[in-house]
Amino acid sequence: MNPSTTQARVVIDELIRGGVRDVVLCPGSRNAPLAFALQDADRSGRIRLHVRIDERTAGYLAIGLAIGAGAPVCVAMTSGTAVANLGPAVVEANYARVPLIVLSANRPYELLGTGANQTMEQLGYFGTQVRASISLGLAEDAPERTSALNATWRSATCRVLAAATGARTANAGPVHFDIPLREPLVPDPEPLGAVTPPGRPAGKPWTYTPPVTFDQPLDIDLSVDTVVISGHGAGVHPNLAALPTVAEPTAPRSGDNPLHPLALPLLRPQQVIMLGRPTLHRPVSVLLADAEVPVFALTTGPRWPDVSGNSQATGTRAVTTGAPRPAWLDRCAAMNRHAIAAVREQLAAHPLTTGLHVAAAVSHALRPGDQLVLGASNPVRDVALAGLDTRGIRVRSNRGVAGIDGTVSTAIGAALAYEGAHERTGSPDSPPRTIALIGDLTFVHDSSGLLIGPTEPIPRSLTIVVSNDNGGGIFELLEQGDPRFSDVSSRIFGTPHDVDVGALCRAYHVESRQIEVDELGPTLDQPGAGMRVLEVKADRSSLRQLHAAIKAAL
């Protein structure tokens, strides 16, 4: 076989040995050797291949697959702007610590700077956003060196996997694996008995890298009035389960003492234990910035968040002494009930349907075993305000840099991964539900994610709920939504679009319905085959009034 074909087959084989089970492929000419190798692996059942037209959405599909499966996922593309389109997904994967492998084909390096078509300096393009940038040299037509080249290629692939999974750093993230390929780019007619240079026996990786243990115990006295702030990427800490906890929807719930974020200003904690990285709620930011309140940061990796510079100590787990005062626990529980009641009462009293109403309806309709994917703007905040009980529910959201990009594709990837895991361990006839709650701008921004070819894997039970207030509702709640700017804010921040969601879905052959908010629960309970979109019309002009009423009720 020709050198490029040999190299591509070796790389794909080693990626599979290292735990890659899903690969997203974008079409191109220069990456043809990789495409042929991936198709062969898909046909033999070693991977599940997903072909997409748009590299930007492909990157987010890979993120959804990776966070849903907890495993590294590759996205493969040709050279040039195809690589640049992975920028947003790479940035998200960096800050969310997602093991995303960008597998890019490149032109031979001697063509750089010559004006050759579709050629750019793509190695190093992602700069500080990747854990590593690794390149393979051009494959040589040198049969006498096949064994040495095989070892070099497999070793480099294992370095890519170790960097992406954080095996030696406890800091998973994106890696750029750039492979220059020389023509011929398609397989030659192969003689009988032609084989790919072999890897280690029994399907083992060429270089095994055991996961690093990262353990930094931190002594914390719980007799001091304490609240826990559990953010994105938080670990599970059973010895903190008794403490009042403000948990973001994506954080694992490890206790039975939840604390509503709006209850925080009503309390005076004496210390804070911060788990993971908080990304929501201004009351949380205010508390973490209070110089009078010590903050202890517990993370699952080497980095820790500290926006205000107020963290007193960091570690990975708490070694606790003392016990929380019963009076403190009782007061926190009372304030939690008070905040939840205030939200529910004002929702019931408000005359118009808002995104918060939609989030409350979705939260109420969820059941254990569901997976929930949330848009990064208002939906993830609204679900938290609605008091979602996340016990038994997997909650996903792109909180790395909290952009609305690629959310439809992320939801599709998460659904495919969740269903795949269920098929391997449960009943393949009853796929678990994935429900995505996103805003209309988020939906429109990634509507091309709905484009799934007829030969590609498709979710068996994914419902995308679009809370459609015809624009950016979050700006109604920010400084830009102040009535002083009412004459211009609707256009330059609200960005109304008047998109016909149903027509857009029909263009992609996706089932869609427009329903009222009180129909959400019953409709979600109706089994849907495949992927569907439920659109709920909402009002954003009264959001500021609703949130002011909730605050006043507190």
UniProtKB/Swiss-Prot annotation:
Task: Give me the gene this protein comes from.
Answer: menD
For this protein, what does the record note about how its cofactor is bound?
Binds 1 thiamine pyrophosphate per subunit.
Q: What does this protein do?
A: Catalyzes the thiamine diphosphate-dependent decarboxylation of 2-oxoglutarate and the subsequent addition of the resulting succinic semialdehyde-thiamine pyrophosphate anion to isochorismate to yield 2-succinyl-5-enolpyruvyl-6-hydroxy-3-cyclohexene-1-carboxylate (SEPHCHC).
Q: Which NCBIfam families match?
A: menD
Q: From what organism does this protein derive?
A: Mycobacterium tuberculosis (strain CDC 1551 / Oshkosh)
Instruction: Please give the name of this protein.
Output: 2-succinyl-5-enolpyruvyl-6-hydroxy-3-cyclohexene-1-carboxylate synthase
Q: Which HAMAP family match?
A: MenD
Q: Which domain of life is it from?
A: Bacteria
UniProt entry tagged with the keyword Magnesium: yes
Q: How does it assemble?
A: Homodimer.
GO process terms (BP): menaquinone biosynthetic process
The UniProt transmembrane annotation reads none
Question: Which molecular function GO terms apply here?
Answer: 2-succinyl-5-enolpyruvyl-6-hydroxy-3-cyclohexene-1-carboxylic-acid synthase activity; magnesium ion binding; manganese ion binding; thiamine pyrophosphate binding
Q: Which reaction equations make up its catalytic activity?
A: isochorismate + 2-oxoglutarate + H(+) = 5-enolpyruvoyl-6-hydroxy-2-succinyl-cyclohex-3-ene-1-carboxylate + CO2
Alphabetical list of SUPFAM superfamilies matching this protein: Thiamin diphosphate-binding fold (THDP-binding) (SSF52518)
Q: What is its EC number?
A: 2.2.1.9
